[in-house]
Amino acid sequence: MAAQALALLREVARLEAPLEELRALHSVLQAVPLNELRQQAAELRLGPLFSLLNENHREKTTLCVSILERLLQAMEPVHVARNLRVDLQRGLIHPDDSVKILTLSQIGRIVENSDAVTEILNNAELLKQIVYCIGGENLSVAKAAIKSLSRISLTQAGLEALFESNLLDDLKSVMKTNDIVRYRVYELIIEISSVSPESLNYCTTSGLVTQLLRELTGEDVLVRATCIEMVTSLAYTHHGRQYLAQEGVIDQISNIIVGADSDPFSSFYLPGFVKFFGNLAVMDSPQQICERYPIFVEKVFEMIESQDPTMIGVAVDTVGILGSNVEGKQVLQKTGTRFERLLMRIGHQSKNAPVELKIRCLDAISSLLYLPPEQQTDDLLRMTESWFSSLSRDPLELFRGISSQPFPELHCAALKVFTAIANQPWAQKLMFNSPGFVEYVVDRSVEHDKASKDAKYELVKALANSKTIAEIFGNPNYLRLRTYLSEGPYYVKPVSTTAVEGAE
């Protein structure tokens, strides 16, 4: 088959209008294993295919792109970088986006290869074309360009090529295309900045990080909403958080939240700003962040009471993030009756809100109530029990009711709540004393889809592996759980059939 492909490739090179041959070659290549093509890589002459891309013939272009995609996979990245440099450069300025995407996918292979990447770094014109691809209308082209530049910047040589040459001017020039392209460049800068303190230093020296932060704290509310997402990404890294603190950015974000009450357009950016602090609290210290920025906690409580589903959703997510570790749980507990009212509100929403918000409420409840066995002190167990009882008059029945609704995602989210409390003795007693609950747990006929079966299995596993379960549930029920566990999540009980004499 490889020999047939090579023969057709030679025919394509020989003829002036080889449309039929391209169709045949395309068809043959689908059947040739890649390892066979690799053995013939030295004989693959791709020049004619690249030339055909310039003919402005739609079908030829489509066929050539597909053929080249297959043949280039058979070539080593170093070979592509050294021998097809001109073709790569032309590909990046081709009017057809599929050609650009093909070219960028090859550049993606090259930048992943430590031997080949130097060929790119030494080709200023090619780098410039990659930068200008960020400014194109096609999002896939822009994303591929950002990915390649981000990968290049992982090395010292790459950082120097991007930030200590004319490329920086090209980046700044591309940013002027429009707002969307400017945000794409910011996205690239934040990706690079997040790698290491040194990478961040290159990006701050370029002035682009400072420009982003100016927009974040500027007057345009829509720009703020976009910029806060990128700044939150930077805050996921320790060096990023340090930089934001040193530059006073965290204080500025807090001050904007303080002033949000008098801003009629605050609903555009407030969710992102509150999310920022929620992530910050979990990554650093919930207690320190909440004590230093009390407006953050205050705003979360306000948003939960809001009638705006967007605000409620963000507040619920943030409470879930904040309460995902013990320190955060204790910070919330200190707010006393306010937090009890908040729990009642979340419990109410988990029953009455639209499905998407119900799921977010259930996820937050799971996060708040979960306690790893090694952290189950008497005080913390009393706290989670008290929180659970604040959710509703009969929380166990509330979540059983939710789990019986015909939405797999909702069913799984309710099972996740049971799983979160399954290793806590007070919850095990509640489950055991709730009529029919143990039967519900071991009943395999309730779940019909894979996700639900997996979620039920996690609940059974959490119960069966608890040290207190045998004592509270009793040995017969404990053995039923162990049997379920050993049979796995997808076990189907065999149906016995009896042969009847004389039956057809």
UniProtKB/Swiss-Prot annotation:
The keyword Repeat does not apply. Signal peptide: none annotated. The modification N-acetylalanine is found at residue 2. One of its GO terms (biological process) is proteasome regulatory particle assembly. GO terms for cellular component: cytosol; proteasome accessory complex; proteasome complex. It comes from the Eukaryota. InterPro entries: ARM-like (IPR011989), ARM-type_fold (IPR016024), PSMD5 (IPR019538). Belongs to the proteasome subunit S5B/HSM3 family. It holds the Pfam family Proteasom_PSMB. PANTHER family: 26S PROTEASOME NON-ATPASE REGULATORY SUBUNIT 5, 26S PROTEASOME NON-ATPASE REGULATORY SUBUNIT 5-RELATED. Keywords: Acetylation, Chaperone. It comes from Homo sapiens (Human). The keyword Ribosomal protein does not apply. Interacts with PSMC1, PSMC2, PSMD1 and PSMD6. Part of transient complex containing PSMD5, PSMC2, PSMC1 and PSMD2 formed during the assembly of the 26S proteasome. Acts as a chaperone during the assembly of the 26S proteasome, specifically of the base subcomplex of the PA700/19S regulatory complex (RC). In the initial step of the base subcomplex assembly is part of an intermediate PSMD5:PSMC2:PSMC1:PSMD2 module which probably assembles with a PSMD10:PSMC4:PSMC5:PAAF1 module followed by dissociation of PSMD5. This is 26S proteasome non-ATPase regulatory subunit 5. Rich in dileucine repeats, which have been implicated in trafficking of a variety of transmembrane proteins. Coiled coil: none annotated.
